[in-house]
Each structure stands twice: as structure tokens, then as C-alpha cells.
């Protein structure tokens, strides 16, 4: 029987096994390959598994071990999925497709389920194309995105936002890391904003993708007006997508202000769901049960 797993640290509370087992009715094996030693985890994969998911802090290291790459994975320079193929180790990045689907679903509720039913394994491609086609109709001018955090997930978020047609700014506690992404991907014309400009940058943009594992101090002082933006009556409401679903930075009073401003907050659980749906198909070659996965993530 085919065998799959997850490497990273820490992963003991990961929801990936729950989603995988729901997607395939427990018919395929999925393990947590726990440990903070990348080389040991990688050896376990090579010795025992057909494919693995990869989470922090191993995404860049796994990318460098691969021999084949999907186009967007190569651009992103980090992988959350490695699968053995007859031609070698293939790296993919379903964070990218998960972000595409999460953003599209926020603006067009129901689109992902509809397109999954219609297009199957090509659903995320069709979602991507649909959003690009509709962008000019829903935004009065070219929309802006702010990516906070420039690790593996942040890099995937930056490429996804730019591919969806957003003018995209990068922000990281270490500005050099953000600048490195901008320099390596000049085709996207990324700009780099300092963390000290977080409030102003958030206020100006239509989309925020927050990938830092911890909360910036400035979040607690954000007002309803900051979340609403400079011209809240023009175009759709601001969307805030956060990667961290375990201890989200936008919670409590910040969430109250997000709701009061009419913004749409997208939990990292939704990102996790959509990256799993698209990633598991690549991992196993079998279409997972999207409905069962969605129900499973709502129950936990």
C-alpha cells in the first residue's frame, strides 16, 4: 500500500492527517514523521514513503533536495510537497494553489466547490483564470496586496497575489529577506515596505496575507478605520488571509474591529483545506473527497 507523511517541526498537532484520512476514507497511510533534524526526516522519507508534505522549517531545504519542479514551485523556491516519480523527486507547492483558491473563495463564495465539481484536477487553474478575468470588474483600479512575512509561505503568497493581478508589497521583520524575494523575482515588480509602515500599508491595500507565526505589536492598536481602508465604499471589502490557524494574530479586539469594518477574515484553516485538496491529488494521483475534508476541518 502507498505510504505518505508529513515532515516539519513541530507537527504533533497538525491537522494534515485528519484531512488526509477524510479525503481518502482511511484507505491510504499517512504518518507524522516528527523531529527537528531535517536530514533524519528526509532519510525516513527516502526509505519508507512514496511522498511527503513539508512544513516549516523544512520547505526550503526540501526544495533544494528535489530533482524536478513544477513551474510555480521553481519560482517560489520552497516546497511543501515532494513525491517520488519514475523520473526523480518532484517538488510542488500547494501553498500557492491553496492561496489562489482561498482568495478567490473570499471574493466569489462557492467558486471552489463549483469548479472542483466541474473541472476536477484542473479546478485551481480555472479558478486562477476566472479571478484574473473578473478582477477588472470588481476593483475600480488595480488592487494592492500586502504580504507580511517572507518565509516559505510568504514567498508563495507573494507569487500567488501577483499572479492574481495584485500590485504586491512585501514586509518582513528583516527587510533584507523581503528584498531578496523582490530581487529574485523582478517580473512581479514587488516593492518592499518596512514593518514600521504596517498600519499605513494595511490601510491602503485590498488584500492582506499574514504569514508571520507571531503577532506584530501594531495589530493591537489598529482601529476600525484602519481595517476599513481609505475608501471603503469603493470596490469589495478588504480581505485578510492569515496562515496561522492555531494561534492567530488577528483575534479578540482586532477581530471585532475587522468585523465592524466589514472586512472578510479568512482563517488559515481554509488555506490549509485548499492546499490539501490540491496537494493530495499531486501526492497520491487520486482525487480526494473535498466535501469530506471540508466537513472534517469544521469539526476540529
Where are these regions (language model features)?
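Glycine-rich adenosine-cofactor-binding loop
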Residues: 8, 93-95, 103, 143-162, ...
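Rossmann-like NAD(P)-binding element
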Residues: 199-221
Amino acid at each position: 500500500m502507498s505510504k505518505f507523511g508529513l515532515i516539519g517541526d513541530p507537527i504533533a498537532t497538525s491537522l494534515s492527517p485528519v484531512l488526509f484520512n477524510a479525503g481518502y476514507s482511511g484507505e491510504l497511510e499517512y504518518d507524522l514523521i516528527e523531529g527537528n533534524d531535517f536530514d533524519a526526516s528526509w532519510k525516513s522519507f527516502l526509505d519508507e514513503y512514496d511522498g511527503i508534505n513539508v512544513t516549516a522549517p523544512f520547505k526550503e531545504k526540501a526544495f533544494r533536495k528535489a530533482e524536478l519542479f513544477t513551474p510555480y514551485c521553481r519560482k517560489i523556491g520552497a516546497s511543501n510537497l515532494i513525491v517520488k516519480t519514475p523520473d526523480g523527486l518532484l517538488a510542488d507547492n500547494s501553498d500557492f494553489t491553496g492561496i489562489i483558491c482561498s482568495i478567490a473563495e473570499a471574493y466569489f463564495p462557492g467558486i471552489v466547490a463549483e469548479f472542483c465539481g466541474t473541472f476536477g484536477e484542473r479546478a485551481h487553474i480555472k479558478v486562477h483564470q476566472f479571478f484574473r478575468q473578473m478582477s477588472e470588474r470588481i476593483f475600480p483600479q488595480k488592487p494592492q496586496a500586502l504580504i507580511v512575512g517572507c518565509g516559505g509561505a510568504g514567498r508563495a503568497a507573494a507569487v500567488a497575489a501577483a499572479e492574481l493581478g495584485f500590485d504586491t508589497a512585501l514586509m518582513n521583520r528583516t527587510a533584507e529577506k523581503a528584498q531578496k524575494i523582490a530581487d529574485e523575482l523582478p517580473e512581479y515588480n514587488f516593492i518592499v515596505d518596512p514593518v514600521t509602515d504596517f498600519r499605513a500599508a494595511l490601510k491602503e491595500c485590498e488584500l492582506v496575507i499574514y504569514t508571520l507565526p507571531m503577532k506584530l505589536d501594531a495589530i493591537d492598536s489598529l482601529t476600525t478605520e484602519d481595517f476599513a481602508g481609505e475608501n471603503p465604499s469603493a470596490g469589495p471589502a478588504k480581505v485578510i488571509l492569515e496562515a496561522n490557524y492555531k494561534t492567530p494574530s488577528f483575534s479578540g479586539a482586532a477581530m471585532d474591529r475587522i468585523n465592524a469594518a466589514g472586512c472578510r477574515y479568512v482563517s488559515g484553516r481554509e488555506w490549509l483545506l485548499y492546499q490539501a485538496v490540491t496537494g493530495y491529488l499531486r501526492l497520491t494521483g487520486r482525487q480526494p473527497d473535498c466535501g469530506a475534508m471540508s466537513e472534517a476541518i469544521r469539526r476540529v
